[in-house]
């Protein structure tokens, strides 16, 4: 996987590589070059969520090995996140476990994570999103972006 990713790196614009590095750096809290259980716990706590050890272990098991920048980049470029993986990422913030999140909370998360969305970008991001009564239905959204059309509500 490392060779394939390095080959892709030479073809990517420097700006895109830099954006990917910044995204990885936000996740790699201890800056050791790998995403660890402690990194995931720290970033979750920054976002107001405290996952237990079982949840953290389950998240790390989704990766085929230690997650370094090259592996992170390969995953992002191949777009291989499964529907379940994406749903699980949203579920981390779903304290009511009702498969819905407050849309304002999602917008705040995006702003807090340094994505620098302006109002127009934020509006466009959620223009087609399944939002009813201020609640973002992440199961429907995930099915929509992955093209499964499944509705597991």
Swiss-Prot record:
One of its GO terms (cellular component) is myosin complex. It comes from the Eukaryota. InterPro entries: EF-hand-dom_pair, EF_Hand_1_Ca_BS, EF_hand_dom, Myosin_RLC. One of its GO terms (molecular function) is calcium ion binding. Ca(2+) binds at residues 28, 30, 32, 39. Residues 15-50, 81-116 form the EF-hand domain. Coiled coil: none annotated. The keyword Repeat applies. SUPFAM superfamilies: EF-hand. The modification Blocked amino end (Ala) is found at residue 1. It holds the Pfam family EF-hand_7. Keywords: Calcium, Metal-binding, Motor protein, Muscle protein, Myosin, Repeat. In molluscan muscle, calcium regulation is associated with myosin rather than with actin. Muscle myosin contains two types of light chains: the catalytic light chain, essential for ATPase activity, and the regulatory light chain, a calcium-binding protein responsible for Ca(2+) dependent binding and Ca(2+) dependent Mg-ATPase activity. This is Myosin regulatory light chain. It comes from Patinopecten sp. (Scallop).
């Amino acid at each position: 996987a490392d060779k394939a990713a390095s080959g892709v790196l030479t073809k990517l614009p420097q700006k895109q590589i830099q954006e990917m590095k910044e995204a990885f750096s936000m996740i790699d809290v201890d800056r050791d070059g790998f995403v660890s259980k402690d990194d995931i716990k720290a970033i979750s706590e920054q976002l107001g969520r405290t996952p237990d050890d079982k949840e953290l272990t389950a998240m790390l098991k989704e990766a085929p090995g230690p997650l370094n920048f090259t592996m992170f980049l390969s995953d992002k470029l191949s777009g291989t996140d499964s529907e379940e993986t994406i749903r699980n990422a949203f579920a981390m913030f779903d304290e009511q476990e009702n498969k819905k999140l407050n849309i304002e909370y999602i917008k705040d998360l995006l702003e807090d994570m340094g994505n620098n969305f302006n109002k127009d970008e934020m509006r466009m991001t959620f223009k087609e999103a399944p939002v009813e009564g201020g609640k973002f239905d992440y199961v429907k959204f995930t099915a929509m972006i992955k093209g499964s059309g499944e509705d597991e509500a």
